[in-house]
UniProtKB/Swiss-Prot annotation:
Residues 1-58 form a transit peptide. PANTHER family: PROTEIN PLASTID TRANSCRIPTIONALLY ACTIVE 12, CHLOROPLASTIC. Residues 80-100, 115-167, 468-541 are annotated as: Disordered. Required for the activity of the plastid-encoded RNA polymerase (PEP) and full expression of genes transcribed by PEP. Required for the proper build-up and formation of the PEP-complex. Binds single-stranded (ss) DNA and RNA, but not double-stranded (ds) DNA. Its main location: plastid. This is Protein PLASTID TRANSCRIPTIONALLY ACTIVE 12, chloroplastic. Keywords: Chloroplast, Nucleus, Plastid, Transcription, Transcription regulation, Transit peptide. It is found in: Plastid, Chloroplast stroma; Nucleus. Residues 521-538 have a biased composition (Basic and acidic residues). Residues 144-154, 508-519 have a biased composition (Polar residues). It comes from the Eukaryota. GO terms for molecular function: single-stranded DNA binding; single-stranded RNA binding; transcription regulator activator activity. Disruption phenotype: Pale yellow-green leaf phenotype. Reduced levels of plastid ribosomes and defects in plastid mRNA metabolism.
C-alpha cells in the first residue's frame, strides 16, 4: 500500500522545516487529521479554505501494511431453516429462496440499504428541544459547509504585505459532498401530524355506522313539504267539465306503497305529499330491506329493557290502560306470588284471535317486521286483502261503476273499443254494410254491358295453335283471295262478325279488366292499307315478320 501525507496550510508560528526529498511547495509533515480541526477554532474559521496555491502530494509505497482476509466478517449464516418448506435452505446461491440483488424488484435495494444504515455516531452536547427549535444546533455548521464548498481553493485577500500566501488544500471534492450528505442524514426533524377533528357524521361514515346520505351540516333546507295538488308529478290535464277527483287517481294500494306510507307515519322516512310516488315507494322498499335486521335487533333490545309484558301488551287491547311496568309486575308478584311468566300467560288469555294473528302473522316461526306488526287494520287489508272468502277491500263492488284509470303515468282513460273503432271508421253497423253492398251491386249492374251470344260457339274458342306458322299464313292468303271475290256488303258483315269475335276473345282472356272498368275494349279502327305510313305500319304490326310482309304488300 501507499501511505499519503497531506501538506497542511502553514500558520504563523509553525516550523518551516523542509523534509528530505524534492518538494516544490512548503509542506509540513504531520499525521493526517480531519479538516474539521480548523473549523473548530473560532478565530480561524474565516481563514479556512481561502488559499488557491496547491502543493504536490508525496506518496511513499509501503508494503508493510497488509490486511488479514480472516478479519473480513463472514455473512451471518449460510443457510436457514425455512418455515414454509420445513427444510434447510441456502441463504445465497442458485438454490436460495431469496434471489440475488440484480433480481430484486424496484425499490427493494433502497429499503435494504436504509435498514442497514448505521446509527449516528457522536454524543449530543445540548438538551433536546423536542421539535420546538428544529435544526437550531446545526444551523451555523450548515452555513459554514456551504460557504466552504462555494469558495473551495480560493485565495485569501486579507493577508499582510510580505507574508507568504496562505494555502488551503482539500483532499477531494467527494469527501466534502459526503460530509454534507452525512450532516443532512444524521438529523431527522419529526413533525407531529395534525389531528383532524371529525364531526359526528364523518366519524359515522368512517366507522361504517348508519349515517345519512348527505351531511346534515351541508344539506340544504327543502322547506315545507308541498301538498299532493302542488307537486308537479301529480299534474293532470284539466277536463272540460269539472268532475270529482276519484280515489282511483291514486296508485292502487300495493305492498311497497302501503309500507312506504306506514314508514312515513312512523317517522322512518319522509315523503312529499299525501301518498308516496313510485320512486319513494321503491326507495322505502330498499331501505326496509336493508335495515330490517337492525330494526329487529332494536326490538329485541326494547323487549329486554321494558320486559315481555309491557312489550306484548301492545297487541292486547284489554291491557292498553293497565300498568305493565317492571315495578307494577314486581308489586303484583309480591302480593299474589305470580311470577312474570304467569302474568304473561294471563295477559295472553285476554288476547283475541285477530290480535294474535296481527302479532304473529301467518307463521309463528317467522321473525315479523316490527313495522308490519304495528300497521293499522286498514293498511293490512290494503296489502293482504280482507276476508279471502268474501273479499271486501281489493275489488270494486258496483258493477256499473265507471272507473277512472288515469294514474301517475298521465295516460288518458282506456276508451271503449267498439265506439272507438266506429268513431275512426274502422267498424260500421250491419245496416250500413248492407246499404253499401246494395249500392255496389247496382253500380255493377249498370256498368256491365252484356255481349250477344255468338251463333257458333267454336268461333269464340281460343286458338291453341293447331296449325304451324306456314299453314296459318297460307290460310290468311286464302282469306284475302276470298274477300277480294266477295261483294262489299258481305265484306262489311264479315268485318262486324270478326270484331265481335275479337272482343269476346279478349273478354275471355282478360275478364279482370272488364270487371274493373265495366267496359269492353273497342277494337282499333283499321285504316286502309293505302293510307298507312311506315311508322304506322311498324306500330300496327305485331312482329317484324308481319311488318315486312305488310310493307311488301304496300309496295
Amino acid at each position: 500500500m501507499a501511505s499519503c501525507y497531506n501538506p497542511w496550510r502553514l500558520f504563523p508560528g509553525m516550523s518551516t522545516a523542509v523534509p528530505a526529498g524534492p518538494v516544490t511547495a512548503p509542506a509540513h509533515s504531520r499525521t493526517c487529521k480531519s479538516s474539521k480541526v480548523f473549523s473548530a477554532l473560532p478565530h480561524r474559521r474565516g481563514l479556512l479554505f481561502l488559499g488557491t496555491r496547491r502543493a504536490r502530494i508525496k506518496c511513499v509505497k509501503d508494503d508493510s501494511l497488509h490486511f488479514d482476509p480472516s478479519k473480513i466478517e463472514p455473512p451471518p449464516y449460510s443457510s436457514y431453516f425455512d418455515s414454509t418448506s420445513g427444510q434447510l435452505e441456502p441463504a445465497s446461491g442458485a438454490r436460495a429462496s431469496i434471489p440475488g440483488k440484480e433480481y430484486w424488484p424496484e425499490g427493494t435495494a433502497a429499503r435494504v440499504r436504509a435498514a442497514r444504515a448505521p446509527a449516528p455516531v457522536g454524543e449530543s452536547a445540548g438538551m433536546p428541544s423536542f421539535g420546538t427549535k428544529p435544526g437550531s444546533r446545526r444551523r451555523g455548521y450548515k452555513e459554514q459547509v456551504t460557504s466552504a464548498s462555494g469558495t473551495e481553493g480560493a485565495q485569501t485577500d486579507d493577508r499582510k504585505d510580505g507574508d507568504e500566501p496562505d494555502v488551503a488544500i482539500i483532499g477531494s471534492g467527494d469527501d466534502a459532498l459526503e460530509e454534507i450528505k452525512d450532516s443532512v442524514d444524521e438529523y431527522v426533524i419529526y413533525e407531529t401530524p395534525e389531528e383532524e377533528e371529525l364531526s359526528e357524521y364523518d366519524m359515522d361514515k368512517m366507522m361504517g355506522r348508519p349515517h345519512p346520505f348527505i351531511d346534515p351540516a351541508k344539506a340544504m333546507s327543502l322547506g315545507e313539504p308541498k301538498t299532493s295538488e302542488e307537486l308537479w308529478w301529480h299534474w293532470r290535464r284539466k277536463s272540460q267539465e269539472e268532475e270529482m277527483w276519484s280515489r282511483w287517481q291514486r296508485r292502487r294500494p300495493d305492498v311497497d306503497t302501503v309500507f312506504a306510507k306506514a314508514m312515513a307515519e312512523t317517522g322512518q322516512i319522509k315523503i312529499f305529499g299525501d301518498h308516496p310516488s313510485r320512486t319513494e315507494a321503491a326507495l322505502a322498499k330498499t331501505r326496509r330491506h336493508l335495515y330490517k335486521e337492525e330494526r329487529l335487533e332494536a326490538e329485541q333490545r326494547r323487549l329486554e329493557e321494558i320486559g315481555p309484558i309491557a312489550y306484548y301488551s301492545e297487541w292486547v287491547e284489554a291491557y292498553k290502560n293497565k300498568d305493565t311496568s317492571r315495578e307494577a309486575i314486581q308489586k303484583h308478584f309480591e302480593e299474589t306470588g305470580e311470577d312474570e311468566n304467569v302474568q304473561l300467560i294471563k295477559m295472553f288469555q285476554h288476547q283475541t284471535a285477530g290480535e294474535y294473528r296481527i302479532m304473529m302473522g301467518t307463521d309463528v316461526r317467522i321473525q315479523r317486521d316490527p313495522l308490519a306488526m304495528r300497521m293499522r287494520e286498514d293498511q293490512i287489508k290494503q296489502i293482504w286483502g280482507g276476508d279471502p272468502v268474501y273479499p271486501t277491500i281489493n275489488y270494486v263492488q258496483d258493477p256499473d261503476e265507471v272507473i277512472d284509470y288515469r294514474g301517475p303515468e298521465f295516460h288518458e282513460p282506456t276508451p271503449e273499443v267498439v265506439p272507438y273503432l266506429m268513431e275512426h271508421g274502422i267498424m260500421i253497423t250491419k245496416e250500413e254494410l248492407y246499404a253499401r253492398l246494395n249500392e255496389e251491386r247496382e253500380d255493377v249492374n249498370q256498368d256491365i254491358t252484356y255481349i250477344p251470344e255468338a251463333k257458333d260457339p267454336m268461333a269464340t274458342a281460343i286458338d291453341i295453335g293447331e296449325h304451324s306458322y306456314n299453314e296459318d299464313s297460307d290460310d290468311e292468303d286464302e282469306d284475302v283471295d276470298k274477300a277480294a271475290a266477295q261483294p262489299q256488303s258481305l265484306e262489311d258483315e264479315e268485318d262486324d262478325r270478326d270484331d265481335v269475335a275479337e272482343v269476346e276473345e279478349k273478354v275471355n282472356q282478360n275478364w279482370s279488366a272488364l270487371k274493373s272498368t265495366g267496359q269492353a275494349e273497342k277494337p282499333k279502327e283499321k285504316s286502309k292499307k293505302d293510307e298507312m305510313t311506315l311508322k304506322e305500319a311498324i306500330d300496327d304490326s305485331e312482329n317484324l315478320t308481319d311488318f315486312l310482309m305488310d310493307f311488301e304488300e304496300t309496295e
